[in-house]
Swiss-Prot record:
GO molecular function, one term: ATP binding
Organism the protein comes from: Flavobacterium psychrophilum (strain ATCC 49511 / DSM 21280 / CIP 103535 / JIP02/86)
UniProt name for this protein: NAD kinase
UniProt lineage: Bacteria, Pseudomonadati, Bacteroidota, Flavobacteriia, Flavobacteriales
Record-level GO BP terms: NAD metabolic process; NADP biosynthetic process
Cofactor(s) the protein requires to work: a divalent metal cation
Catalytic activity: NAD(+) + ATP = ADP + NADP(+) + H(+)
Amino acid sequence: MKIAVFGQFYQNSTSPIIARLFAFLNQNNIQVVIEEKFAAILIENKSIANTYQKFSSHKDLDKSFEMLISVGGDGTFLRATTLVRNSGIPILGINAGRLGFLATVQQENIETFLQLVLEKKYTISKRTLLSLKCASKIEEIKDLNFAMNEITVSRKDTTSMITIETYLNGEYLNSYWADGLIISTPTGSTGYSMSCGGPILTPEANCLVITPIAPHNLNARPLVIPDNTEIKLKVSGREENYLVSLDSRIASVKNEDILTIKKTPFKINMIEIPEETFLKTLRNKLLWGEDKRN
C-alpha cells in the first residue's frame, strides 16, 4: 500500500499525532511519501528520520497512491484538495486543529481508524467543488480555480458596501448590497456560510447556497439552488478592486469583471469512517441535541 502524507504546520501538540501515525504506518509496512515542505518541518523538529520519499506537487501523485492523509485542521484538508485535484485519490483527515468537520480522525482513534481503512471498512463521500472563471486573468489563482468549501466575493480597502449583481443561468436574480456574497457547496455549508446565517446541507445534497454577508437590503436571505446552476456575478463599488476567495486562496479583481461560478466536472473523494459520519459530526462538533440546562 502506498500513501501520501501532507501537513502545513508543526506544534507541540502535533508531536504525539505524528509519532502515532508513523508508528502505525511503519508497523504495517506501508510505503509513505511525504510532501516535501511538511517533511522538512518534521525532520527539523526531529519527528521523523530523513529516509522517506517526498513529493513536491500534484504532478507527483499518480494512480499508484491509494490515499492521501492530511494532518492538521480543516484548512489543511482544503489545501490537500489542491494536491489531489481530479486524480480521484481519496483523502483522510487526521485532526490536529480545532473543530474538525473534514479532519474527523481524532488523536486517540488514529490506530483504530487506520486499521479500518486498511481493512477497507470505510465509505467514500464524494464532495462537490466549485470552479471560477473570470473575464480577465487572475494571476494569483492560475490553475487552482476551484474550491471545496466556498467562493466568496467581498469588499477591499474600504468600509463601504459593494453591489453584487447576481444571475442564475442567465436570468437576473438580485443585486446584493452587502459586505460580500458567499457561494457555498454542501461541504462549505457548515463553514463561513453557516456563520452568516446560511442553512446546513448534507454532503449528498445536489445543491449550492448563496449567502449574503451583512446585507443592507434586509429582505435578502440565503438561497438554496440546484448545483447544476451557472452563477454569474458582477461586482461594483467605490474602490477599483474587490476580493475573491476560493477557500483560503485570495485574489484581487477589478470592478465590473464578470465572474462565472459553476460545479466542477470532478469531485473530491473523502474517506468516511462509520464511527465518524456527517450526522455524528454535527452532534459532536455543533452539540446538536445537547441541553446545557440539565
